[in-house]
């Protein structure tokens, strides 16, 4: 079963990330075997409306880097992109992050649900 310890790990990851966009994210918890995840997946529901997102046009490097899916270098690259001559403080489309060498397609897919543009 899950038990108190593993339940606490799930809650901790959910809190740190700002919610889950996929039940498959539970596989990121090292101390919970895939066999247990496979058993509980049918009972898990995900509420995308409750995801906590970060506005990339108004967040500092420190705030961006606070998210576990964003490295310091990625946070700095987002900030620098926002303030380059073309953007003048405003990124218009999240997909622009794919033009940064700091973001692989995989990195972007993992983090995009936690980012927003206001």
Language model features with spans:
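Compositionally biased linear targeting/interaction segments
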Residues: 1-118
């Amino acid at each position: 079963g899950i038990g108190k310890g593993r339940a606490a790990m799930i809650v901790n990851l959910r809190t740190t990330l700002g919610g889950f966009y996929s039940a498959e994210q539970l596989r990121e918890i090292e101390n919970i075997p895939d066999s247990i995840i496979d058993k509980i997946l049918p009972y898990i529901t995900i509420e995308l409306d409750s995801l906590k997102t970060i506005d990339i046009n108004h967040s500092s490097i420190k705030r961006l880097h606070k998210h576990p899916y964003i490295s310091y270098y990625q946070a700095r690259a987002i900030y620098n992109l926002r303030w380059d001559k073309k953007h003048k403080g405003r990124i218009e489309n999240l997909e622009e992050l794919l033009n940064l060498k700091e973001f692989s397609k995989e990195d972007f897919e993992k983090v995009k649900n936690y980012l927003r543009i206001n």
